Regions:
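Glycine-/proline-rich flexible loop or hinge segments
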Residues: 59-71, 98-102
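Terminal intrinsically disordered/low-complexity segments used for targeting and assembly
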Residues: 1-65, 221-265
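A glycine-/polar-enriched beta->alpha junction
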Residues: 68-75, 81-96, 107-109, 117-135, ...
């Protein structure tokens, strides 16, 4: 029985099982995952986030801010701690149960007292402890993998939102120029029509082009606002104004990346 008890023991790891997630994140994403388990650690992370936000964000910086700051990811980290606690609890000895009964009765002028004390153990839980620990270890390992996967998912969504936001804002700037040109064209068409050099059809065509350009710009502005708000949420920031982005997307590479072993890797 002692062997069963010893084999079922489990204890908390110094890092709460987070090192596996951190190493996987560094290897697959190239980012630093940190779990703020104290106020001091949270302050250090906040300082790092402030430094990253002090300049226009690059794509990798945006991913790093999201990993540091995303509230959903913080919840996943705490789920990892809960999973480890369940694993450790499965390896703890079940508490014994102590009960005492005290009775008395009087008979023939004599009072008799009766005291019963019972100490019980959950023998079934004790015997099945090693199996329970093994199950919780597997659950803990699965939680580690799921947490690392959640980090990768957040990084992917952040990259998409980052480039989508820059593209949306670049489209707004382009469509503003289009609207300005269309507005100038509509104004010129109106003046030309007034002096008889444009007929009504030509004027209506220019006016329609201006109205279409204005509508396209309004839609682009709404899409830009929505894209920036989504990026703000992924980064865990309180306001879209906290983000500074480059004015344009990076140039495409002149040559495609060479991936000779991509088929074998796939």
């Amino acid at each position: 029985l002692g062997t069963l008890v010893l084999s079922g023991c489990a204890s908390f790891s110094p890092d709460g099982g987070f090192d596996t997630v951190r190493e996987t994140t560094r290897a697959r994403i190239g980012a630093d995952a940190q779990w703020a388990r104290s106020d001091e650690a949270r302050k250090e992370i906040d300082t790092r986030v402030t430094e990253l936000l002090a300049k226009p964000l690059a794509a990798e910086d945006a991913v790093q801010v999201a990993i540091y700051n995303n509230r959903g990811l913080r919840a996943a980290f705490y789920d990892l701690g809960i999973s480890e606690a369940e694993m450790v609890q499965a390896g703890r000895l079940p508490n014994p149960h102590f009960s005492m009964l005290r009775t008395s009765r009087a008979e023939n002028g004599v009072r008799e007292f009766k005291i019963e004390q019972v100490l019980t153990f959950n023998l079934f839980a004790l015997i099945t402890m090693p199996l329970a620990v093994e199950v919780e270890k597997r659950n803990f390992a699965q939680t580690q993998r799921m947490t690392a996967l959640e980090v990768a998912r957040l990084a992917s969504e952040t990259r998409k939102a980052y480039f989508g936001t820059i593209a949306a804002e670049e489209s707004v700037r382009y469509l503003r120029k289009v609207r300005q040109a269309a507005e100038a064209g509509a104004g010129l068409a109106r003046k030309m029509a007034e002096v008889g050099n444009f007929n009504r059809l030509q004027q209506a065509r220019e006016q329609g082009f201006y109205a279409s350009a204005a509508l396209d710009l309004a839609r682009a502005e709404q899409a830009s606002i929505a894209a920036r708000e989504r990026l703000t949420k992924l980064l865990g920031l309180p306001s879209p104004q906290a983000i500074r982005l480059p004015e344009r997307l990076p140039d495409l590479p002149k040559l495609p990346d060479e991936l000779p072993a991509v088929e074998q890797t796939a």
